[in-house]
Swiss-Prot record:
The keyword GTP-binding belongs to this UniProt entry's keyword annotation: no
Quaternary organization: Part of the 30S ribosomal subunit. Forms a loose heterodimer with protein S19. Forms two bridges to the 50S subunit in the 70S ribosome.
Keywords: Ribonucleoprotein, Ribosomal protein, RNA-binding, rRNA-binding
Entry-linked PROSITE patterns: RIBOSOMAL_S13_1 (PS00646), RIBOSOMAL_S13_2 (PS50159)
A Gene Ontology cellular-component term: small ribosomal subunit
Functional description taken from the UniProt entry: Located at the top of the head of the 30S subunit, it contacts several helices of the 16S rRNA. In the 70S ribosome it contacts the 23S rRNA (bridge B1a) and protein L5 of the 50S subunit (bridge B1b), connecting the 2 subunits; these bridges are implicated in subunit movement.
Protein encoded by which gene: rps13
Name of the protein: Small ribosomal subunit protein uS13
Species in which this protein is naturally found: Pyrobaculum islandicum (strain DSM 4184 / JCM 9189 / GEO3)
Gene Ontology MF terms: rRNA binding; structural constituent of ribosome
One GO term of the biological process aspect: translation
Family: Belongs to the universal ribosomal protein uS13 family.
Amino acid sequence: MSQEIRAIVRIGDTDLDGNKQVAYSLTKIRGIGIATAYAICRKLGIDPHAILGALSEEQINKLDWAVRNLHELAPAWFLNRRKDPETGKDLHLIGAELVLAAKRDVDLMKKLKSWKGVRHSLGLKVRGQRTVTTGRLGPVAGVTKKKAAAGGK
């Protein structure tokens, strides 16, 4: 009895490779790392080393639900957005939501003119790194050689 393997599986609004193991396929979703992928598999009782495309439709639906609702399965310290400034809830954002939330956070810092916001708006380093020799922007100035001196003695 041969089992058909789907080449592409859609989970969390992302197309995943169905020929890879479940845990490693889940890491292709932005916001899901390897530790999170293994935790999801462990919570759902799915073998993380099974081939994703070989899973049943029910198991794939369970995975999709778990990826979207990780805040219900995992403790607060495991989530990527704790105490959201707008709602005050612990969330785990994935995909485009994660990118937009980070952009909104930076825009809010710029609007409030906090130290980090000012650094972001000036395009400088934000986390206290040195800026004298590293992180230089723009074209390289380069060095020009002087013309060789005319014949010697």
